[in-house]
Design a protein with these regions (language model features):
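Basic, flexible Lys/Arg- and Gly-enriched helix-loop patches that mediate nucleic-acid binding at interfaces
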Residues: 1-184
Length: 184
């Protein structure tokens, strides 16, 4: 289309003068970030072949670009899930080299004794790699179920569940309550 005086251009527009393309540097739109409280039963995928509800079905539409999740939460995990339209921001939040903390409230069947607690803080081997919690604090609990707050700086697949499993405890509820400075 032919431009008119005062017309604005946006990131991604192609501009030609006398039929020849010209280069114009325009900053990309600012990154958007959205905090979402994911319930259990939703999957973190754009399209689920099994027809289960997805987190992306509940997000507001973007005019330009698309939402990408900052990490994932499995089907049976609830809590804070971040979304952004910036791949660079998503990488800075997810990549282990940046050390962004993720905090979880974890209900386990059984009690974490001091020996198991120390193992989880110093590191256990999971699928050939060392994994550990940055911190573990005791929460409330009655009967056979006990709550703990744990912090990790990596987000490997089912890492919190696998760590507790490595010391003989089964996670029966998992809630991400914090991602970096963002709290649920």
């Amino acid at each position: 289309q032919v431009a008119h005086i005062g017309q604005r251009i946006s990131f991604g527009d192609r501009i030609k003068v006398a039929g020849r393309p010209i280069r114009v540097r325009i900053a990309p739109p600012p990154a958007r970030i959205l905090a979402y409280h994911k319930p259990t039963g939703e999957v973190v995928t754009h399209d689920d072949p099994q027809g289960r509800p997805t987190v992306f079905q509940r997000l507001p539409r973007l005019q330009n670009g698309k939402w990408m999740s900052v990490g994932r939460l499995d089907l049976n995990t609830e809590g804070l899930l971040l979304f952004t339209n910036s791949g660079e921001l998503a990488n800075q939040l997810m990549h282990p080299r940046f050390g962004v903390e993720r905090e979880y409230a974890v209900r386990v069947l059984g009690t974490l004794d001091e020996g198991a607690r120390n193992k989880l803080l110093t590191g256990v081997e999971i699928e050939g790699q060392s994994a550990s919690f940055v911190s573990i604090s005791k929460g409330e609990g009655e009967g056979v179920n006990q709550w703990y707050r744990v912090v990790i700086t990596e987000g490997r697949n089912r890492e919190v569940r696998k760590l507790f499993d490595a010391v003989g405890l089964t996670v029966n509820r998992l809630i991400r309550v914090r991602y970096g400075a963002i709290v649920l």
